[in-house]
Structure formats: C-alpha cells, structure tokens
Amino acid sequence: YYKISAIWGGHEGSLLLWVVILGGWIYAVAVKSRNLPQDIVARVLSVMGIVAVGFILFTLLTSSPFERHLPMYPQEGGDLNPLLQDIGLIIHPPMLYMGYVGFAVAFAFAIAALLSGQLDAAWARWSRPWTNVAWAFLTLGIALGSWWAYYELGWGGWWFWDPVENASFMPWLVGTALIHSLAVTEKRGVFKSWTVLLAIFTFSLSLLGTFLVRSGVLTSVHAFASDPERGYFILALLAITIGGSLLLYAIKAAHVKAESSFELVSRESFLLLNNIVLVVVALMVLLGTLYPLLLDALQMGKISVGAPYFNAMFIPLMSLLVVLMGIGAIARWKATKSEFLIKQLWLPGVLAVVVGVL
C-alpha cells in the first residue's frame, strides 16, 4: 500500500490528489443537485470548474506527475522518506484534502448566490450539508495528523503549533464559524452577508494552507514536498480567488435585503459572538504563522513564534468561547429575558467555578 500512498508523498502527487478529489466533489455536487434550480447548479459547477482549471494548469505546467525521468533514474528506485513509511500517510493526507477541497463547494454556492443576487436562506440550505461533510473530513484529517505526530519521533507531540498544523487549523476554525452561521441563515434568515464572507474566507484559508505547505516559505517539521518557485503560482491563484471574490462581494452584498431583527440578548447574538471569537482566533493563528515570514521579507531579522504566544492568546479566547456556547445553548431565538438566563445559569455557573478552583 505504500506504492499507492507514495503518490501523494511528493509535491506532484499531492497536487494530483487535490485535483482528483476536487473532481470527485464536482461529480457529487452534479449528481446530488438535480432537484435544485438549474441556473444555480450551473453557476456552482462553473465556479468549481474554474478552480479545477487553475489547479490542473498548475499541475501540468509546473508539477506534472507524469514526467518521465528515463534514463536518469535510481537503479533501485527512490525510497520513500522513512518518516512517511507509516499508515498515517495512507489516511491523513486524503482526509485533510477532502476537507480542504470540500470547502470549495460552500465557496461555489456563495459565489453563485452573489452572482444570482439570491442571498437568502435557500443557498444556505443547499450548501450546509456539503459544508458539514467537508468540516467533518477536515476534523478527521487534523485528528489523524495529531495521532500520527504523537507517536512519530521528533514531531513535538500531538500539537506543536507548527506552521503546517496551523495551515489546516485556520480553515477549520473559520469553517466551524461557517457551519454555525449557515444554520442561523437557514433557520432565521439572518447573517446573510456575513455567511457569504465566511464561505469565501474558509476556502481562501484552505488555498493559503496549500501555499504554505507546498511553497517551502515556512520551516516545518512536516515539510516533505516544497518548492518556493511553484509556490508563487499558488499565491497568484490565491490572490485571484480572494481578490475576485471580495470584489464581487463588495458589489453585490450592498444590495442584500434587510435581515430579520433580533434583540441584543438572543441566541442569534450569542452565535454571532461565537463566530467573531472563532474568526479572531483564526486571525491570531494567521498572524503568528506569517509574522516571521513578513519580518524576513522586510530584512528585519529571523524569528520564530512558538507555543508560548499561541497558548497565551488561544486559552483566554477559547475560554470565552466556551462561556458563549453555554449561554447560547440556553438563549432563545429573537429575544431572551435576562432574568430567564440568570435563573437557568446561576447554578451551573457556581458549580463550574467550584470545580475549576478545585
């Protein structure tokens, strides 16, 4: 089975895996969306097709896995890196890529909604199942990667805040915000513009993760297949995707109809705060990951941002998120009386403080 998994152990093969998985997602959307309006399906498939064309061109022009090296080839063949001769290589990258590429579906539905001007609950209902599946695959991929790193010598335990780990964690954070926001948009018709923006950012961070992993611009214990020159192509694709999407968003989002109203103390408010915290955490991780690269590019020296920074920022923000989750689960839609929340939360709050102190 290493003969198969070795395909994505190198740069060219990993891009081929990306393209194949994207083709699988496109096929699944085409088959499962026959009951949706055909104009929407056409736009969704067109957007995904454009993304596929970009990666296919990248693969063929700079990273063709079909290049022949005859007659200059190793007599006994090229061995797979010993660290990669593990069952983790078989299951971890495909699951991770299923999540990365799967967010292209939510991105495509968001762009299709912007193009059609139909930013309503319908597009959220159509894209939410795909987003949930992509998020589940990415979660599984990250968990498998942590399990692999835990027992692999020299990889810093189950989580090291390594740049490549961060590259997969950022779309997971924003993707988590996205699946919650899609649920609210579908049920209550609110957060329409915000949800589209999250869909754009989630897929953009997936592309950024690919750039960080495959370009070699960041030092990582996971760096097995990197090429800075090829990274520029992915960076250009990333710039076109983000720039074009945000330009379309700026033009179309201003025409979105007024959303349903909700009070300051309501489930919608707590879910929005939940989203904001997750996005702030993702930005914090992005800053810690790219800051050394920025300083190096400006010739201001070389530094490394390690676990102390991430832990100092991550722990208080995620603690706040846990509190918001607890309150939001009890709060009611549209409006919630403060007295009701106090009555429901005072006992669990006291118990939580006591257990925390002990």
Predicted regions and their residues:
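Conserved active-site neighborhood of enzyme catalytic/cofactor-binding cores
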Residues: 131, 142-150, 156-158, 163-208, ...
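Membrane-interface interhelical loops and short amphipathic "cap" helices
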Residues: 1-12, 64-93, 144-167, 188, ...
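Structural signature of hydrophobic alpha-helical transmembrane segments
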Residues: 13-19, 97-100, 160-173, 214, ...
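Central hydrophobic cores of alpha-helical transmembrane segments in multi-pass inner-membrane proteins
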Residues: 18-34, 105-114, 172-182, 320-328, ...
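Mature extracytoplasmic enzyme cores
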Residues: 1, 10-71, 76-77, 83, ...
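Hydrophobic alpha-helical membrane-insertion segments
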Residues: 48-61, 198-206, 275-286
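Contiguous transmembrane helix-bundle modules in multi-pass membrane proteins
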Residues: 163-170, 220-358
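Membrane-interfacial loop-to-helix junctions in multi-pass inner-membrane proteins
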Residues: 28-52, 115-136, 161, 184-200, ...
